[in-house]
């Protein structure tokens, strides 16, 4: 019974082939495509408004050089947002609960920001490893600490997204299981549990959106340090 709670985090298979790739591609098919008319419909207008709002928030702390990343970061946040929200639907698989996928997104992008800084301004990038005004005896220790904190950034990005979504899905499944189990014997308690489940679902919708935003926002801040 305990192991069955984690079955939702296993990639489903069809004829021996994992279905994680279609689950990653499906959210991109849900976005409306722009029409050929001069005036867009309401759905396309809402989509463009959301994309412009997200892009503005991400690009505000960056200079003009960092604006080259606008398409990549906006596409990434829309992909994560779609996958996280679709994962809250019943009988669906959430790819972002897999640490391997989140690390595959976090590590290359973090490494790209680091290499850009080392190529364009190596002195300023290396200066981040030593805070200004550090006493001489503490310099080796602080360099080791700052280097460690720099290297664990992609791990923190991936683990944060995985842990938050996994915990939310487990809580929803545990409370929903308790609601069904209490319904025949204690209907009043089951009703209260169902209300808690509704509030938790609303909270998880907010968590899904916030975690997608935090993931990309931290990448933009890492980029800001290196351009």
From Swiss-Prot:
Gene giving rise to this polypeptide: MT-ATP6
PANTHER family for the chain: ATP SYNTHASE SUBUNIT A
Catalytic reactions of this protein: H(+)(in) = H(+)(out)
Family in the record: Belongs to the ATPase A chain family.
Protein name stated in the entry: ATP synthase F(0) complex subunit a
MF terms in GO: proton channel activity; proton-transporting ATP synthase activity, rotational mechanism
Keyword field: ATP synthesis, CF(0), Hydrogen ion transport, Ion transport, Membrane, Mitochondrion, Mitochondrion inner membrane, Transmembrane, Transmembrane helix, Transport
Residues that span the membrane, as ranges: 12-32, 69-89, 98-118, 139-159, 170-190, 196-216
Main subcellular location: mitochondrion
Cellular localisation: Mitochondrion inner membrane
Disulfide bond positions: none
Provenance organism: Coturnix japonica
Biological processes per GO annotation: proton motive force-driven ATP synthesis; proton motive force-driven mitochondrial ATP synthesis; proton transmembrane transport
GO cellular component: mitochondrial inner membrane; proton-transporting ATP synthase complex
PROSITE patterns, alphabetized: ATPASE_A (PS00449)
Function of the molecule: Subunit a, of the mitochondrial membrane ATP synthase complex (F(1)F(0) ATP synthase or Complex V) that produces ATP from ADP in the presence of a proton gradient across the membrane which is generated by electron transport complexes of the respiratory chain. ATP synthase complex consist of a soluble F(1) head domain - the catalytic core - and a membrane F(1) domain - the membrane proton channel. These two domains are linked by a central stalk rotating inside the F(1) region and a stationary peripheral stalk.
Residue ranges that the Swiss-Prot or TrEMBL entry lists as coiled coil: none
Pfam families on file: ATP-synt_A
Topological relation to the membrane, as annotated: Multi-pass membrane protein
InterPro entries named among the record's database cross-references: ATP_synth_F0_asu (IPR000568), ATP_synth_F0_asu_AS (IPR023011), ATP_synth_F0_asu_bact/mt (IPR045083), F0_ATP_A_sf (IPR035908)
Known partners and oligomeric status: Component of the ATP synthase complex composed at least of ATP5F1A/subunit alpha, ATP5F1B/subunit beta, ATP5MC1/subunit c (homooctomer), MT-ATP6/subunit a, MT-ATP8/subunit 8, ATP5ME/subunit e, ATP5MF/subunit f, ATP5MG/subunit g, ATP5MK/subunit k, ATP5MJ/subunit j, ATP5F1C/subunit gamma, ATP5F1D/subunit delta, ATP5F1E/subunit epsilon, ATP5PF/subunit F6, ATP5PB/subunit b, ATP5PD/subunit d, ATP5PO/subunit OSCP.
């Amino acid at each position: 019974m305990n192991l069955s709670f984690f079955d939702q985090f296993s990639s489903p298979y069809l004829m021996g082939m994992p279905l994680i790739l279609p689950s990653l591609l499906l959210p991109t098919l849900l976005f409306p495509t722009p029409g050929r008319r001069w005036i867009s419909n309401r759905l396309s207008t809402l989509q463009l408004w959301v994309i412009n709002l997200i892009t503005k928030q991400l690009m505000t702390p960056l200079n003009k050089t960092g604006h080259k990343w606008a398409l990549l970061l906006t596409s990434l946040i829309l992909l994560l947002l779609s996958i996280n929200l679709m994962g809250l639907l019943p009988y669906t698989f959430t790819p972002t609960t897999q640490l391997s996928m989140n690390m595959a997104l976090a590590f290359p992008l973090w490494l790209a920001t680091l290499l850009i800084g080392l190529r364009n301004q190596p002195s300023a990038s290396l200066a981040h490893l030593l805070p200004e005004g550090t006493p001489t005896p503490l310099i080796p220790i602080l360099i080791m600490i700052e280097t460690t904190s720099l290297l664990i950034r992609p791990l923190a990005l991936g683990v944060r997204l995985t842990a938050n979504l996994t915990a939310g899905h487990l809580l929803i499944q545990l409370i929903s299981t308790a609601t069904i189990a209490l319904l025949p014997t204690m209907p009043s308690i089951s009703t209260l549990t169902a209300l808690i489940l509704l509030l938790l679902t609303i909270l998880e919708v907010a968590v899904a959106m916030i975690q997608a935003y935090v993931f990309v926002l931290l990448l933009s801040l890492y980029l800001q340090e290196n351009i």
